[in-house]
Amino acid sequence: MFPFKVRKWMGLACFRSLVVSSSSIRQKKLIHKLQEEKAFREEMRHFREKIEDFREEMWNFRSKMRAFRGEILGFWEEDRLFWEEEKTFWKEEKAFWEMEKSFREEEKAFWKKYRIFWKEDRAFWKEDNALWERDRNLLQEDKALWEEEKALWVEERALLEEEKVLWEDKKTLWEEENALWEEEKAAWVEGVVPVVEQQVLEGGHHHVSGRPRSPASSRGRA
């Protein structure tokens, strides 16, 4: 019974270390994930600021476009000056479209990264839920093992109580046996002493073979 209990306790210790190790790994993964999410949200904030800057540039360009159209309607007579301004305007427009192209490429890269991030995020939480479910099952198994161990302790305690009762019974039997031996010893002494005295008086011997009589024969004569 005791070797079985030692193996049982060793198994419980290994099982509990597995539960603690699994919880520690899950906690580290959660911390790392939260740090990644914090960095990504900071990057998202910077990108939103870029979006606001781009919108401001776009509205400025639209204002220039409206002003340019006004100049077209009001200053046909200033043809040369108008074409210089138009040339400058088209340069600014080209610069604006280059900036927009760069912004769109950056936006495309950002949303690609955004999709990858949320894909990894879903995979992470799926794995985290699986780990949580595993931890919950391990804890339930650990609870069941504790209940089983408790039942074993109760059973062992009952066996010890039975063993104690058996020892008490055995002790009582020993005491009764000792009392019987004492009674037999007293009876043997009472039976042998008068016979020896009688034989001594008659000048006889203890026995033909020279050995003393047995307690049984002495009790028989008595």
UniProtKB/Swiss-Prot annotation:
Organism of provenance: Bos taurus
The name on file for this protein is Coiled-coil domain-containing protein 70
Recorded GO cellular component terms are:
plasma membrane
List each coiled-coil range. Answer: 34-62, 129-188
**Entry keywords, A to Z:** Coiled coil
